[in-house]
Amino acid sequence: MVPLFVKKRYNTPEEKALSNAIEELDEDKDKLVEYAERPHSADIDLETKQVLGIMYPALTESYNLMCKLVKDEYDINISKKIDWDKILYEKQDEFEKIVKDHTKAFILFGDDNKFIRQMSLVLDTETVSIFNKGMYEELKDICDYAIVTGAVEGGCPKCFHGEVPIAELKLPPYHPRCECIVRYHEKGTEELV
């Protein structure tokens, strides 16, 4: 389901396309719910493979959404700066271990709500981690810090508010789940980009 603020905020064709992209990501996440609600075998490797079949497409969808947000907001084609397949390959073992550990705990203890929350968090964390590699490479030489706005008002538990050095920033330029917005400060100017 698309967050309410998205329905209120987006009115132009481009904005509606963005809203649709968010909805597609939500549909990917709904597959996790469907998985969690059905019966499972005791074969951890088999179950992990099924979860990864959901997580990899959702990871790519989430990444593509962030690239679109940056292109719309900053006119920077960040997807050309990041070799997505290469980074995903480098992170494959680590990512699959995280997913396997959570899947194993789910199969053993059966807490589907906790499992869905954990997988959503893994999806958000890994996407932002990969995405930021490209974003920081693009902005680190021209910007020195960023100002995060909306975090306090949005009440997002993952976000902070105020001035943050570029090297310490852990958010994408726009966080679609809570409307936190990051403005990058260009060195030697009073401008935020």
Indicate residue ranges for each PLM-predicted region.
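Aromatic/histidine-rich interaction motifs
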Residues: I130-E168
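Short Cys/His-based metal-binding microdomains
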Residues: E153-T189
